[in-house]
Amino acid sequence: MTAVESRPAGVIGTSQSPSHRPFGARVKAFVALTKPRIIELLLITTVPVMFLAEQGVPNLKLVLLTCVGGYLSAGGANALNMYIDRDIDALMDRTSQRPLVTGMVSPVECLVFGITLAIVSTLLFGFTVNWLSAWLSLGALLFYVVVYTMILKRRTSQNIVWGGIAGCLPVLIGWSAVTNSMSWAPVILFGVMFFWTPPHYWPLSMKVKEDYARVGVPMLPVIASNKVVARQIVIYSWVMVVVSLLLQPLGYTGWFYTAVALAAGGMWLWEAHGLQNRAKAEVTGGKLKEMRLFHWSITYVSVLFLAIAVDPFLR
């Protein structure tokens, strides 16, 4: 999942000596390392699945512990991602105000912070939730840091497709936190998030593809035309909507979720096809309106998972 960061073009962050790093600013910098806005979306997909697994209101203490563990785990992954990507972050407009680039946090501090969060989150999950959730959480962190950030991101245009698996695991964690087991319901929702991730991220990549091209990151919009990217977005979008409708036939949800999934999915497909039509017409610049789909993708996943949480009470 993705949050947009920006700065005036051409402004490069500069290192700061310890004496010029106020305590309050330092605290904010460490919080920024965790990418809170992204984690909000991850938790939006975790908590509703707990309602689905419980078929009602789950234990609130369990929800709190799962949210705290999830935040720490995702925060650790994000901090380690920033540590690894600090070289290219300094060259990209949208990331050059990150704490490592500005010097508000040193690389060693960031590395220690990320590893500490990873360890604490795993132990918290294991001792207060269950060890299945702990291993899933650790697996998500390692997949994001090692497989996506270190291996895929700078090597293949399919980076976000397979790297996005890390962002799909919170639905499994939400289910396992309640049941200490797996079922087809979280697997289906894993599929929804898997096919959601590329058409969520590619519109943003279309907007900032010059940034990625500058640092040699082969995002699909960097190496392919807008027509090709838009066609891929439409394909993934259709599969995502179809997968989202599998819960009711298998008996996991009722009419309410299905109605919301159809309505929200229909709006998504409208936006996706609109982007494809503009790309086919070779519209460029602001008229391409690629960010409309990016913003709608966040609304879509929020509405869909809210429906998952509400549906058990209407059956």
From Swiss-Prot:
GO biological process: heme biosynthetic process; heme O biosynthetic process
One of the record's GO cellular component terms: plasma membrane
Cited Gene3D superfamilies: UbiA prenyltransferase (1.10.357.140)
PROSITE patterns: UBIA (PS00943)
UniProtKB keywords: Cell membrane, Heme biosynthesis, Membrane, Transferase, Transmembrane, Transmembrane helix
Pfam families: UbiA
Membrane topology: Multi-pass membrane protein
Chief localization: membrane
Subcellular location: Cell membrane
Class in the EC hierarchy, top level: transferase
EC number(s) reported in the record: 2.5.1.141
InterPro entries in alphabetical order: Protohaem_IX_farnesylTrfase, UbiA_prenyltransferase, UbiA_prenylTrfase_CS, UbiA_sf
Protein's pathway: Porphyrin-containing compound metabolism; heme O biosynthesis; heme O from protoheme: step 1/1
Catalytic activity: heme b + (2E,6E)-farnesyl diphosphate + H2O = Fe(II)-heme o + diphosphate
A GO term for molecular function: protoheme IX farnesyltransferase activity
Transmembrane residue ranges: 38-58, 62-82, 111-131, 132-152, 159-179, 184-204, 233-253, 255-275, 293-313
Family affiliation: Belongs to the UbiA prenyltransferase family. Protoheme IX farnesyltransferase subfamily.
Additional remarks: Carbon 2 of the heme B porphyrin ring is defined according to the Fischer nomenclature.
Record-linked HAMAP family: CyoE_CtaB
Function, in words: Converts heme B (protoheme IX) to heme O by substitution of the vinyl group on carbon 2 of heme B porphyrin ring with a hydroxyethyl farnesyl side group.
Xref: NCBIfam families: cyoE_ctaB (TIGR01473), PRK04375.1-2 (NF003349)
Protein name in the entry: Protoheme IX farnesyltransferase
UniProt organism field: Streptomyces coelicolor (strain ATCC BAA-471 / A3(2) / M145)
Lineage, opening ranks: Bacteria, Bacillati, Actinomycetota, Actinomycetes, Kitasatosporales
Designated gene of the protein: ctaB
